[in-house]
């Protein structure tokens, strides 16, 4: 107990070991779905799901432990939703890069992220990007996740006449996905910890009876991480065509992680004078996790908004995060269960997360068309072009153009002009490629 007090200063934060552990378990239950969802998504890129499962558990444990031990923050880290889908379905699936090259792009973005954090530029860059575009990025990624979820569940299918259409609702996967989604929403309404995780497990169990899935056991030694460990192709990622991808990874990581860290830390009462040094340490731990995750073999790692659940349960120190880290390490031994989770079992989780992300629409300034229109353009272009980068590009270009032609150019930060110019040059030079 004395060691824990010395490490985490529990009394100074008005908490105790029991409260911190309960908070850690609460946070873990709200985000444990990622150990099933991330391998499922990255498998679509051709990555070995067993190795990705191990990489997911390890980076979640290592990143969260560093957040707890180094920054003494009750915030958990894991591979982020949205960028994993962009990695698999766009960078690899649509653009044709290998997953090794895509990991190289994540590595480079992680190095950039680490550099701007070390030099104190992270907050400066974030403040230079319009709030409307920061908000729209979250909304657009939510819509992007939604269409992926509906496709994975078989609810939406391709159509030569209308691009997309309704799938066959009589198929068992569609029905099971719908049941899983309703279950998640109902459990969330009643504030049941681990609602998303329960939904995934429930649909997986149903798949054994109605989907032809086969139970492969529950516990086993962790699979090998060798197929993904240090398999990144950095030289391939340095080629001109993929630099656009690096920029997307970098920008989304920047806004998502920084916003989450600030939001959760503020709720925990940690963003006050005298405690900002710890926030800077949290930024560094978060940045290092992206770098490390690419080496292990997973898409970008980020701070999880679900950490707010642990803060709500009383978590105030890094002991909460360390508890989460230990639980992620324990998950290494349930690989047989993770290996039989079908895509239509994780689809309800994706769709629910997408629904939650759309609430950010209320943050847009609907009284100023020069703010709301670029935001909406950003959000809409992501799912409709099936590419997060295109949404960002059209959003920044539209924002700069509208401000310029309405006499509000002075309102635009220099960082926004630079990003808009980069995207415009890319479109002029490469078109829609």
Predicted regions: what is each one?
Residues 95-209, 322-433:
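Membrane-embedded alpha-helical modules
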């Amino acid at each position: 107990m004395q060691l824990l007090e010395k490490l985490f200063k529990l009394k100074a934060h008005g908490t105790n070991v029991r409260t911190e552990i309960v908070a850690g378990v609460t946070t873990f239950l709200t985000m444990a779905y990622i150990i099933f969802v991330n391998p499922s998504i990255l498998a679509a890129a051709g990555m070995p799901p067993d190795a990705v499962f191990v990489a997911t558990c390890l980076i979640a444990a290592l990143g969260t432990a560093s957040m707890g031990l180094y920054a003494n923050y009750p915030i958990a880290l894991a591979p982020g939703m949205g960028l994993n889908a962009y990695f698999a379905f766009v960078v690899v699936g649509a653009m044709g890069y290998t997953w090794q090259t895509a990991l190289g792009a994540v590595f480079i973005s992680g190095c950039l992220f680490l550099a701007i954090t070390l030099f104190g530029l992270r907050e400066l860059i974030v403040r230079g990007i319009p709030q409307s575009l920061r908000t729209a990025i979250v909304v657009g990624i939510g819509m992007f996740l939604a269409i992926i979820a509906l496709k994975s569940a078989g609810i939406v299918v391709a159509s030569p006449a209308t691009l997309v259409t309704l799938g066959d609702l009589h198929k068992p996967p569609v029905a099971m996905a719908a049941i899983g989604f309703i279950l998640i929403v109902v459990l969330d309404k009643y504030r049941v910890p681990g609602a998303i995780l329960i939904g995934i497990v429930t649909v997986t169990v149903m798949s054994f009876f109605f989907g032809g899935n086969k139970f492969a056991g529950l516990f086993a030694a962790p699979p090998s991480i060798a197929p993904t460990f240090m398999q990144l192709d950095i030289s391939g990622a340095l080629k001109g065509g993929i630099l656009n991808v690096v920029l997307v990874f970098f920008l989304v990581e920047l806004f998502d992680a920084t916003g989450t860290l600030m939001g959760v830390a503020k709720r925990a009462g940690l963003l006050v004078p005298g405690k900002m040094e710890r926030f800077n340490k949290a930024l560094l731990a978060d940045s290092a996790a992206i770098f490390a995750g690419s080496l292990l073999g997973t898409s970008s790692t980020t701070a999880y908004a679900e950490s707010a659940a642990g803060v709500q349960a009383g978590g105030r120190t890094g002991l909460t995060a360390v508890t989460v880290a230990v639980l992620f390490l324990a998950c290494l031994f349930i690989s047989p269960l993770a290996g039989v989770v079908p895509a239509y079992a994780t689809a309800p989780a994706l769709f629910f997360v997408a629904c939650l992300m759309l609430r950010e629409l209320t943050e847009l300034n609907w009284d100023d068309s020069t703010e709301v229109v670029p935001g909406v353009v950003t959000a809409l272009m992501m799912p409709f072009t099936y590419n997060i980068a295109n949404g960002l590009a059209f959003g920044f270009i539209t924002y700069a153009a509208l401000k310029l032609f309405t006499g509000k150019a002075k309102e635009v930060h220099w960082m926004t002009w630079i990003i808009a110019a980069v995207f415009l040059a890319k479109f002029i030079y490469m078109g829609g490629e």
